């Protein structure tokens, strides 16, 4: 399986989630299963079956996160010398050439993407157009609504 890029913040968030799942939810679910067992007949015990189902979902999420972390190539963009070039992990200010509207995006891994939070996937059309370009460059982004031209205003390593 190939490694996929992830920011330091993305890896930290996944590690915190695993810690919460293992340290808080897992013990709570085990307790709920134990309490449901005490109620008697397990065949028709809705509380028991609900707790077991929740346990399965939590364990699956733990396995999923651990697999992602083991296959992640964590990239600390702050450790890379600033060159004005757009690379994975950089935060980029771009201006729409037509409307002069400026937006800021951080280029992150697929699992970290959150457009409302200003984080776009490295595989998104905007990120693919920006990667490798430098401050001052004009880029053409192909979108479903048509081509949009942007100018790279600033590239930051934060």
Curated annotation (Swiss-Prot):
SUPFAM superfamilies, sorted: FKBP-like, GreA transcript cleavage protein, N-terminal domain
Record's keyword terms, sorted: Coiled coil, DNA-binding, Transcription, Transcription regulation
UniProt GO MF annotations: DNA binding; RNA polymerase binding
GO biological process terms on file: DNA-templated transcription elongation; regulation of DNA-templated transcription elongation
Coiled coil: 53-73
Pfam families in UniProt: GreA_GreB, GreA_GreB_N
Keyword Transcription regulation included in the entry's annotation: yes
Functional summary from the UniProt entry: Necessary for efficient RNA polymerase transcription elongation past template-encoded arresting sites. The arresting sites in DNA have the property of trapping a certain fraction of elongating RNA polymerases that pass through, resulting in locked ternary complexes. Cleavage of the nascent transcript by cleavage factors such as GreA or GreB allows the resumption of elongation from the new 3'terminus. GreA releases sequences of 2 to 3 nucleotides.
Family: Belongs to the GreA/GreB family.
PANTHER family with a match to the protein in the record: TRANSCRIPTION ELONGATION FACTOR GREA
Protein name per its UniProtKB record: Transcription elongation factor GreA
Organism: Pseudomonas aeruginosa (strain ATCC 15692 / DSM 22644 / CIP 104116 / JCM 14847 / LMG 12228 / 1C / PRS 101 / PAO1)
């Amino acid at each position: 399986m190939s490694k996929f890029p992830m920011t330091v913040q993305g890896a930290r968030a996944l590690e915190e989630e695993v810690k919460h799942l293992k340290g808080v939810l897992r013990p709570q679910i085990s307790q709920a299963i134990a309490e449901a067992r005490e109620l008697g007949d397990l065949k028709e015990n809705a509380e028991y079956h609900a707790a077991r189902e929740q346990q399965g979902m939590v364990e699956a999420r733990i396995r999923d996160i651990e697999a992602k972390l083991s296959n992640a190539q964590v990239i600390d963009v702050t450790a890379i010398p600033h060159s004005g070039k757009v690379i994975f992990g950089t935060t980029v200010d771009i201006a729409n050439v037509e409307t002069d509207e400026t937006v800021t995006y951080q280029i992150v891994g697929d699992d970290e993407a959150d457009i409302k939070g200003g984080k776009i996937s490295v595989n998104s059309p905007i990120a693919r157009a920006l990667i490798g370009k430098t401050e001052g460059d004009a880029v053409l982004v192909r979108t479903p609504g048509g081509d949009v031209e942007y100018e790279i205003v600033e590239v930051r390593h934060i």
